[in-house]
C-alpha cells in the first residue's frame, strides 16, 4: 500500500513538472536577430533556410514560415533587409519571401546593388539607386504596422544624433515611426562610405511632418542587433498579457537565435603598432570600422551568453557565427559570382561545425533542437487559444 502510494506521488510530481515545463514553453518569448554585413548576408541567409525547412518537416506544413514562430525578428543593415523579407506580407497576408528565397535574392540583386559606383573620391562608393529601386519593387507601400510579427530594425539619425528603432510596439506612442518598409530598409543599409544617407518624412499623431535623416543601423548597434532585439522582446513580455508570467530579464523564458555575417577577428587581418604608426586618416577609418565591428560582435555575444549562463539558460541562446573568414569573403561589397559562391560554402560548412570548443553539438544539431522547441511552443499556443 505504501509502495503504491509512493508511486502515485512520484507520478503526480512528474506530471506536475511536465505540465509546468510545457506551460513555461508555451509562454516563452522567441527572438531572431541578424547582424549587418552587406553581401556577407549570404552567410546567415543559409541558416534561416535550414531552420525553416526543419519546421516545415516537423509540422508537416510546406507553408510554415519563420514569422509564424518568432515573436520578435530584428536586424541591422543587411540583417534589417532579411528581417523585412520574412516579415513583410504579400497579398495573401503571408511573408512575401520564404527563407529559401534569401540567398537567391543576393545572387540576383547583389551585383547590381554593389555595381553603381559613383566614381567619386569624396562621397559614398555607391549611389544606392538600384538598392532603393529593388526595395520599392519588393516591399511596395507596406508600413511597419503591417509586419506579420514584431520587428526591430535599427538606424541612426545624423540630424538628431540619436538611434531610431522601428518596431510595431512603439507605434502607439510614436506613430511617426510607422514608415514605409522600403524607407526603413534603405536607411538601415545606408552604411557610411558605401551608400548615401536617406531622407524621408512621415507624420505625427496630430498630422505634423516628421523628418528623418538616417544612416546604417550598424552605427546604432555597432553591427550586432541581438541586444536590441532582446530588449524589444523583454518589453513585449512585460506589456503583452500572453506573457504575464515572465518577469523582467527572466531569460529562462527567452529563446534567442543570433545570426552573424562572419568575422575575421580570429585573426586573418592583424596589425602591429609599427605598421599602424604609418597610417593616415583614411587607412585608420577603414581599420577602425573592421575592429569595431569585430569587437562589438564579440562583446555582445560575451555579455548575452554570460547572462543566459548566470540564469542557467545557456541552451536558450544560440549564436551562429563564422570567426575565420579570409580573402574576399571578408569584404562587405564583393558581389562577384565567385565570392558569393564562397559565402554560400561558408554558410553550408558552418552548419557542420561545433557550436563551441567545449561542446560536440554542431550548429545543425543545435538548430534542430531550436526547431523542436519552436514547433512545440507553437502547438501549445494553438491548443491554449482553442480553449
Swiss-Prot record:
Glycosylated residues in this chain: 115, 326
SUPFAM superfamilies listed in its UniProt record: FabD/lysophospholipase-like
UniProt-listed InterPro entries: Acyl_Trfase/lysoPLipase, PNPLA_dom
Position of sequence motif GXGXXG: 36-41
Superkingdom as given in the UniProt entry: Eukaryota
Keywords: Coiled coil, Glycoprotein, Hydrolase, Lipid degradation, Lipid metabolism, Plant defense, Signal, Storage protein, Vacuole
Coiled coil: 322-385
PNPLA domain segment(s): 32-230
Short motif (GXSXG): ranges: 75-79
Gene3D superfamilies tied to this protein: Cytosolic phospholipase A2 catalytic domain (3.40.1090.10)
EC number of the protein: 3.1.1.-
Gene Ontology terms for molecular function: monoacylglycerol lipase activity; nutrient reservoir activity; phospholipase activity
Top EC group: hydrolase
Active-site residue numbers: 77, 216
N-terminal signal peptide: 1-23
Miscellaneous section: Patatin have a dual role as a somatic storage protein and as an enzyme involved in host resistance.
Entry domain remark: The nitrogen atoms of the two glycine residues in the GGXR motif define the oxyanion hole, and stabilize the oxyanion that forms during the nucleophilic attack by the catalytic serine during substrate cleavage.
Protein name as annotated: Patatin-11
Protein source organism: Solanum tuberosum (Potato)
